[in-house]
């Protein structure tokens, strides 16, 4: 299944992501990534690579290295370079046998590393972007909205994942600030 990911060698992957791989100047202000490059970054699951490594390092008790990996990911691919997606929020899906599979996103990884401020900053930015996206979709004529139902569903799914993160990590103040006041919804 594409949902079940194999084991990783943290030392090798850390060395490759932090020292070997070169991503060019993609994070610099004067560089624009075209649609195909952004799509490729999504296909290779750029943020997921870093997040998975950080989560494994955290399991090994290497918190500082995990934080370094997350910071490197966000340094290379801030939202202005690579728009936030499900690899920021995390993914929780049902399995065929009635179970659940969960892949942490970078926000959850930051929370688990104790970097609440960074997690909240990314979450807040992503929430605001998704909210604007939903407003844009809702302003469309119904006929047009039906042609982008997948995008609407994805945005709504990610908003719900963000709400769950806020609730799970007891970020009541940020929930209120963002206008999410119902913890039991």
Task: Give, region by region, the residue ranges found by the protein language model.
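C-terminal luminal/periplasmic domains and tails of membrane-associated envelope-modifying transferases
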Residues: 1-185
């Amino acid at each position: 299944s594409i949902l079940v990911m194999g084991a990783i060698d943290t030392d090798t992957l850390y060395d490759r992501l932090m020292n070997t791989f070169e991503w060019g100047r993609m994070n610099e202000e004067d560089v624009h990534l075209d649609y195909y490059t952004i799509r490729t970054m999504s296909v290779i699951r750029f943020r997921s690579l870093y997040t998975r490594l950080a989560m494994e390092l955290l399991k090994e008790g290497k918190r500082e290295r995990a934080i370094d990996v997350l910071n490197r990911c966000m340094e290379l691919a801030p939202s202005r370079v690579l728009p936030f997606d499900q690899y920021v929020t995390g993914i929780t899906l049902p399995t065929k046998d009635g179970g659940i599979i969960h892949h942490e996103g970078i926000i959850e990884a930051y929370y688990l590393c104790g970097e609440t401020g960074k997690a909240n900053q990314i979450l807040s930015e992503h929430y605001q972007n998704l909210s604007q996206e939903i407003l844009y979709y809702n302003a469309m004529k119904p006929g047009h909205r039906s042609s982008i139902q997948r995008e609407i569903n994805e945005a709504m799914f990610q908003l719900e994942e963000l709400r769950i993160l806020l609730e799970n990590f007891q970020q009541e103040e940020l929930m209120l600030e963002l206008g999410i006041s119902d913890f039991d919804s």
